[in-house]
Amino acid sequence: MDPVNAAEITVRHNAEGRRYELVDAGRVVGATHYVPFGGDERIFYHTTVEESYGGRGLAARLVAFALDDTRALGQRIVAVCPYVRAYLAKHPEYRESVAPTRPEHLAAVPRG
């Protein structure tokens, strides 16, 4: 993939799969996964982008889309994923939408 193609990659919400996806020519090349919790929170627990797509800011684009959508729905963000935590640390505009991680959040995250 060259830098020009990065603009052609789309981001979509796969509600059934409980994830936001980076899509290149119909193929999922990255995702950030979440679990709904308590009716008003989303626990983001894992983000991945294929290695060949790395270094182009795509993970940041993906996470920004997911967090913006979550906030627009009036839900709070629970950051278990290290990438999402790091992103939030650099973007204080999300601060009011972030809920602190509690033990019950960790227990709700899928294993494996």
Name each model-derived stretch.
Residues 55-66:
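Conserved acetyl-CoA-binding loop-helix of GNAT-fold acetyltransferases
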